[in-house]
A protein has these predicted regions:
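A short glycine-rich, Lys/Arg-flanked "PGG" loop and its adjoining helix->strand segment in the class I
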Residues: 126-139
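Conserved SAM-binding strand-loop segment of SAM-dependent methyltransferases
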Residues: 87-99
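A short SAM/SAH-binding and catalytic strip from SAM-dependent methyltransferases
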Residues: 110-124
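Conserved beta-strand signature within the Rossmann-like core of class I S-adenosyl-L-methionine
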Residues: 140-147
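Conserved SAM-binding motif I beta-strand of class I
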Residues: 65-70
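A short acidic, Gly/Pro-enriched loop at the edge of an enzyme's catalytic core
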Residues: 37-38, 42, 97-112
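Core SAM-dependent methyltransferase catalytic element
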Residues: 162-182
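Conserved SAM-binding loop of SAM-dependent methyltransferases across substrates and taxa
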Residues: 49-62
């Protein structure tokens, strides 16, 4: 019986490790697919655990910069710790601000990334988040929305906000809306 339990624990642990490796590859692929490298300005509007944010930061070269929007001071301190640990402080920054009223100038980011938009409640607030993303997106900038649902609604809202070049891609099994301002 102990042997069976031990085998089950090992299999579960290997499954979890495999899942984390696949997620990291997924984010690397998304960054590569968007050609997010070098001296570009990136806004990550939905930093969660910070791993994707750090992966994106590693793709940049100074003076390129990624700014991660965080919702509270605890998350801000955690992200600052990750930035320091990954040695990307020259090109990554955590900012505590409201995603429905960003504290950035118009058209200042080459890339804007939003993940987990379906978690924003109430649903009407998602439209406001997208409106702010479009506002800060530079001319010829790219907006990427990584989400598990509501893609058709997001496309409709982006068209309403004046974004015309919109495609839905599947990158490593993840649906991604890529919208380019032209």
């Amino acid at each position: 019986m102990r042997v069976v339990i031990g085998i089950v624990i090992v299999v579960v642990a290997l499954g979890i490790i495999y899942w984390f490796i696949q997620r990291r590859r997924e984010w690397d692929r998304i960054g590569a697919d968007l050609n997010m490298t070098g001296n570009v300005q990136v806004l990550d509007m939905s930093v969660s655990n910070g791993k994707a944010f750090i992966n994106f930061a590693k793709r940049l070269t100074n003076p390129g910069k990624i700014i991660g929007v965080v919702a509270n001071e605890k998350q801000e301190q955690r992200l600052k710790g990750l930035i320091k640990e990954a040695a990307v402080a020259d090109r990554a920054k955590a900012v505590l601000t409201d995603v429905t009223n960003l504290s950035f100038a118009d058209h200042c980011f080459d890339y804007v990334i939003i993940t987990g938009l379906q978690q924003v409640k109430p649903a009407i607030t998602r439209g406001r988040v997208l409106q702010e993303a479009v506002r800060v997106l530079a001319a010829r900038g790219t907006l990427a929305i990584i989400d598990s649902g509501n893609m058709q609604r997001y496309e409709q809202l982006l068209e309403y906000y004046g974004i015309k070049n919109i495609s839905v891609r599947k990158i490593n099994g993840q649906k991604v809306i890529v919208a380019k301002r032209i």
